[in-house]
């Protein structure tokens, strides 16, 4: 399910097509717990990309779709306990990439738990290769997605048959996800440390050219047309290779002087809040990462 969700909502939501009339609900209800029939679903595996799709704290079967699926005997439910981010266009990021690799591993015969672990590792490796770091949205994806169900369960479909065959792998049969991804390391003062991504809000508007601000705002507006463009928040981010810098890294010092380091990237964040027909408030967030040449190198939007 590639739908929206909310922390306090029992439903998962769609999103209004830009070509629809403005009076059409911005987030129409797509799925309710009572839409899931009471008949058992002993062969179902569910992956939800919705924000809070697996948030079950203080919830019951009819206030959580994840619990509803489990109550109808779904063998596995994967979802996020927090915000979930995905792509608006290729390449895949966040929950979209995680879901893709998860289903590939399940189809290849991996147990559900191993499939999710390998999907997380693949996401981390791909982001490290492409970006050189894991940003906060990558971290949230890796940490927030969980599996409810038996992690040793293997789900396979016979060729030409819609029926799924269920089997289990004992602990000794389940292989590890594989070698950990590699990251750059530096040594300072005899201490080894990996690079840390520093992200700081840009308060001095002169650090961002009006032309770049206008161009990125226009890009963000195409995804969240109802949001107020003046509410765009800009942050600078770069890798810090200094251990225990006590917030005296080059990014902080440069920004204090009214400059941005050449290797710094800018992250533009826009939020939109809207009430659903059930009076739940849904917040949607879109983040665009822009390199030093003004190119949008990553675009992530919350589910």
Task: Identify the function of each model-found stretch.
Residues 195-208, 218, 245, 258-269, ...:
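Compositionally biased, non-globular sequence tracts
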Residues 280-300:
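A short, surface-exposed beta-strand/turn
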Residues 205-257:
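Short, non-transmembrane alpha-helical segments in secretory-pathway proteins
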Residues 171-211, 295, 300:
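Preferential activation on post-signal-peptide N-terminal prodomains/segments
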Residues 1-59:
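Catalytic-core segments of thiol-dependent peptidases
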Residues 45-172:
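Active-site-proximal C-terminal subdomain of hydrolase catalytic domains
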Residues 3-9, 31-38, 64-68, 134, ...:
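Generic recognition of flexible, low-complexity loop/linker segments
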Residues 236-287:
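Exposed beta-strand-loop-beta-strand "reactive/processing" segments of non-cytosolic proteins
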